UniProtKB/Swiss-Prot annotation:
InterPro entries according to UniProt: Cyclotide, Cyclotide_bracelet_CS, Cyclotide_sf
Described function: Probably participates in a plant defense mechanism.
The protein's name: Cyclotide phyb-A
The species this protein was found in: Petunia hybrida
UniProt crosslink position (Cyclopeptide (Gly-Asn)): 44-73
Free-text note regarding domains: The presence of a 'disulfide through disulfide knot' structurally defines this protein as a knottin.
Tissue: Expressed in midvein, lamina and periphery of leaves (at protein level).
Record PTM text: This is a cyclic peptide.
Domain of life where this protein originates: Eukaryota
Single Gene Ontology BP annotation: defense response
Amino acid sequence: MVGVNSLRSALYLIVLILFVQLTYFSDARVMDVDLSRAFLPLTGIGCGESCVWIPCVSAAIGCSCSNKICYRNGIIPKK
């Protein structure tokens, strides 16, 4: 029974720590950062494939290869 009680106490402690951290996190002011330009800067819509060894399979829907990545309808990034 000692093992069960210590396991239960450890579980309660973990739940308490998580609750306190989540409560503190919701009260903290978090800056909203727009990361869309960091991951896809002015490149239009990514077609979801690379064209390192073979050309874009999605060329039928208007994708083209630039810098080893397929893009569609956007400003193609500089190399």
